[in-house]
Amino acid sequence: MKSVALRILTIIVFLAPCFASGKSRGKKTVPFIEASVNHEKAVEGERLIYEVTLFTPDASIAGIELVSEPDFGKLARRRSAADIRLSETERNGEKYYSVVIDRFFLGLEEEGKHTLKGGCYRIGYNRQVAVNDPFWGPGYVNRVEVEELSAPDVTVKASPLPEKGRPDNFSGAVGNFNVTVSVPSGEIIAGEEAYLVVTLSGDGDLSGVAPPDVRQAFAKPLQFKSMTENRNEYISKGELGSELEMECVFVAEKEGTFTIGPISFSYFNPRTRRYEQAESTPVTIEVESGSASKSSPPVYIEI
């Protein structure tokens, strides 16, 4: 059994397996689970955040275990870290503590309707139980009370990417991105390797997307040599964000003032429902003479 958070050590109460999540049994305020995605209406190629959130009136949570996995069918998925901090909230006039207990990034590679079937989770609560030890006498011990809840199903509809307006250089990325270029401080010397950092970032998934064509931004006498990539994903304001950082190595063949051209990246914006293009601002660099920079005072050797 896969553990999502802390491991449950001792069980003293075991309820019926996987109640369908509900907010009340009679008049008693009880825990319940919600499943959600950040966009129920999406487009083909979009990456969604699927979250399972526990709402409980009791903050003394000992741990959470995964009983059965959610079923996403053929959708590409990757589990991400869940939350560990409780937040206070209110539902229907009742006070609850909420926490995201499971999270996935889902890729909508195909258009159409997709049903995301919820998994089952075991929630453990810390309890103090009165005991009468034959040696120590009356007292209290800590135990764990357990309840199992299942997440409800969620339906997502993915619209196809439009053919109209699709550019020839469409990257396949879905989101909203921008491109920036920066040159590290320091002299750039003719004939020596120099560095340029291109950053592609924004809302959406860049994990499987080809990087923009950086080489074309370097015109003679600037010579592109190599590039290394670093990709990161994060969640910001409920949206999936990505960053692709490209460190480029280049050499200027002679001294002078030169321009590194704009770098462009085409993508589909699901909010405007249009193909758009991000483009960096051209960067001007000053290249110093190699012979001047290498001049140095004489070295004296005692003999």
Model-derived features with residue positions:
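Hydrophobic h-region of N-terminal signal peptides that target proteins for export
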Residues: 12-21
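Surface-exposed interaction/ligand-binding surfaces
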Residues: 21-303
